[in-house]
Each structure stands twice: as C-alpha cells, then as structure tokens.
C-alpha cells in the first residue's frame, strides 16, 4: 500500500493536490521510459559501424538512463512501494525505438542515430508531460534535472546524426 503522502504544489496558483498514487504513476512512467532508453542505446551501440568513440558515446547515454533509473527507483521507494517491473527486460523495444526492429546491422550509422534521436524525442515528450503535473518539489527537481540531461543528449545525438549523414553524402 502506498504511504499516504499528499503534497501541495509550490505554485500558489495551482490549487490541486497530487496524491502519492498519482506521483508514483508519473515516476513509474518515467522509469519504464528510462529502461527502454537504456535498452535502445545499447542496441544502437551494438549496431553502429563507425568508430569506437561513437559506440562509447551511445553506451554512455545508456549509462545515463541507468542512472536515471536508479534515481527514479529510489524516489518511488520513498512512497513505500516497489517500482514497476515493466520495461526491465531486455526484450522488445517500444514504439519510439521501432526503427531498430529487425536487423539493425543492415542500417547505416545515420539511420541508427536517427532511431536514437526518435527515442530521445519520446523521452523529452514524457518528461514534458511529467513536468506538467503538480509534482512535489523534490520530485519536480529530480524530473527537471533528468529532463535537462535528456535535452542535452538529444542535441548531441542530433549533431552526431547530422555528421553521419553528411559523411554518407
């Protein structure tokens, strides 16, 4: 049972209160997305043909999602529940990573990086949605920090994709 933690938003104009169940739902949604992102970046790192440094960048992004997972799990547990197990397996990738379905080894690095960028697009959308909720201050701070990291990485992945596409031309 979720520990009853009713939390008032810091926004003086927002009169709504988000209960612990709702907060945990938001955090679990981000947790599933982080697990999917980790799996997606690992798959991309395994599929790219380019330099070792590109593989290392993609694996570093997977590690970033792993760290986000750990932070989200810890926050969920402060509500007295265990986090969802969804997305924990290394199985199928979610819709945002669909371009990797099938034989990713037949794809160019630019195509693989485009799949990474689409995955980051999905992560940005999930974080924006979460930040639109009336989250407790400590949860909002965590979500905001993670969101900013996803935005930075999205820009980096886009730059890598653009460079890989230019090399193909």
Predicted regions and their residues:
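Preference for long, well-ordered alpha-helical segments
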Residues: 112, 116-169
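Generic structural concept
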Residues: 24, 31, 35, 45, ...
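Alpha-helical scaffold segments that form or flank carboxylate-/histidine-based iron centers
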Residues: 21-30, 51-71, 109-115, 138-150
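Conserved alpha-helical segments that form or flank metal/cofactor-binding pockets of metalloenzymes
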Residues: 53-91, 157-160, 164
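Charged/polar positions within long, soluble alpha-helices
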Residues: 39-46, 70-77, 81, 98, ...
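Carboxylate-rich helix-loop segments that flank metal/cofactor sites and access channels
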Residues: 2-12, 70, 74-124
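Alpha-helical bundle segments that constitute or directly flank the non-heme di-iron/ferroxidase center
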Residues: 16-50, 110-134
């Amino acid at each position: 049972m979720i520990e009853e933690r009713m939390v008032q938003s810091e926004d003086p104009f927002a009169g709504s209160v988000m209960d612990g169940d709702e907060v945990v739902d938001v955090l679990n949604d981000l947790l599933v997305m982080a697990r999917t992102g980790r799996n997606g970046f690992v798959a991309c790192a395994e599929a790219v043909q380019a330099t070792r440094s590109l593989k290392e960048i993609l694996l570093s992004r997977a590690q970033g999602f792993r760290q986000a997972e750990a932070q989200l799990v810890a926050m969920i547990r402060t509500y007295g529940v265990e986090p969802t197990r969804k997305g924990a397996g290394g199985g199928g990738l979610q819709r945002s990573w669909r371009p990797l379905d099938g034989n990713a080894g037949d794809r160019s690095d630019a195509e693989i990086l485009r799949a990474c960028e689409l995955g980051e697009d999905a992560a940005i959308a999930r974080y924006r949605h979460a930040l639109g909720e009336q989250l407790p201050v400590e949860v909002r701070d965590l979500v905001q920090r993670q969101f900013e990291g996803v935005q930075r990485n999205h820009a980096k992945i886009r730059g890598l994709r653009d460079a890989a596409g230019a090399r193909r031309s």
